[in-house]
Amino acid sequence: MGARMTRAFRNFNVEKRAEQEISKRKPSMAPKHPSTRSLLQEHLSQYPEIEEEVSRKDNKLLSLLRDVYVNSKDPVPSLPVKAIEPQQQPKEFRLPIGDQFDKNIKDIPKGKITVVEALTLLNNHKLSPETWTAEKIAQEYHLELEDVNSLLKYFVTFEVKIVPPEDRKAIQSK
């Protein structure tokens, strides 16, 4: 039903709309500069055969043009060869601790740690802060001392507290 309606609207008064479009004024050529116009008139008055040559059709050239078939392909752009620059910081690769992460993470660059390692170092620092100082952690995991201090200060692991049952007071029913 929808196609039938759109076809009716599309074909409504087609002849009149086509006639109006054809009868519209076509855009004219931009006006030439007065000096150019005078030079063209002067040149055409000196050589009148140029106007004939321009307006004449050359059948030989037209037949050659009909025989031309262009088959083009874009050229493959040549990639610029970049000089291999040495890496600024050598990477140290470690495998993460634990079996659950060995499938996802293949290597860890120097200066980075995994979540498991972060939790391990936080737990070690929490259990014995005098042995696991920020300097020792930074040296052990190849981290910046400032980052380790921020990690120890702002990152807190979960703590589960179980409230003993004797502290609870029973609610007596009325």
UniProtKB/Swiss-Prot annotation:
Biological processes, Gene Ontology terms: defense response to virus; mitochondrial respiratory chain complex I assembly; NADH dehydrogenase complex assembly; negative regulation of apoptotic process; positive regulation of cell population proliferation
Keywords: Calmodulin-binding, Lipoprotein, Membrane, Mitochondrion, Myristate, Phosphoprotein
One Pfam family here: UPF0240
InterPro entries: NDUFAF4 (IPR009622)
Membrane topology type: Lipid-anchor
Keyword Phosphoprotein part of the UniProt annotation: yes
Post-translational modification: Phosphorylated on serine. Prolactin stimulate serine phosphorylation.
N-myristoyl glycine lipid sites: 2
Cystine crosslinks: none
GO MF term list: calmodulin binding
UniProt keyword Transit peptide, yes or no: no
Modified residues annotated as Phosphoserine in this record: 35
Stretches with biased composition (Basic and acidic residues): 15-24
GO cellular component assignments: mitochondrial membrane; mitochondrion
Subcellular location: Mitochondrion; Membrane
Ranges where the record places region Disordered: 15-38
Induction (record text): Expression is low in quiescent cells and is induced in exponentially proliferating cultures. Expression is also induced when prolactin is added to stationary cells. Induced by dietary differentiating agents such as butyrate, vitamin D3, and retinoic acid.
Assembly behavior: Binds calmodulin. Interacts with NDUFAF3.
Family: Belongs to the NDUFAF4 family.
Protein's job: May be involved in cell proliferation and survival of hormone-dependent tumor cells. Involved in the assembly of mitochondrial NADH:ubiquinone oxidoreductase complex (complex I).
PANTHER family on file: NADH DEHYDROGENASE [UBIQUINONE] 1 ALPHA SUBCOMPLEX ASSEMBLY FACTOR 4, UPF0240 PROTEIN
Protein name: NADH dehydrogenase [ubiquinone] 1 alpha subcomplex assembly factor 4
Organism: Rattus norvegicus
